[in-house]
């Protein structure tokens, strides 16, 4: 099974410069050992089970909460039994379609 989660965590009440605090969440994700990617808006993480992935998301939110009085989180889940490597396969599929002549 593949559980693919895109999430963002935003510390509130700490001023405009939040990059250093958000880095704590990214560190938790990277230290988890699960496949992940971070872009300007979200971090995507993939695991075999809901519990495995959501435990990492929870630790990431807690890492931000340790440094901010309030935290906002946006979470999107793609739960797809029978699929592996969804994070790269979904992008690869779109890239293949882009190579087709119109």
Swiss-Prot record:
Cited SUPFAM superfamilies: MTH1187/YkoF-like
Listed name of the protein: UPF0045 protein Mb1933
Any one Pfam family match given in the protein's UniProt record, by short name: Thiamine_BP
Assigned GO CC terms: cytosol
Transmembrane segments: none
Species whose genome carries this gene: Mycobacterium bovis (strain ATCC BAA-935 / AF2122/97)
UniProt family annotation: Belongs to the UPF0045 family.
InterPro entries: MTH1187/YkoF-like (IPR029756), Thiamine_BP (IPR002767), UPF0045_domain (IPR051614)
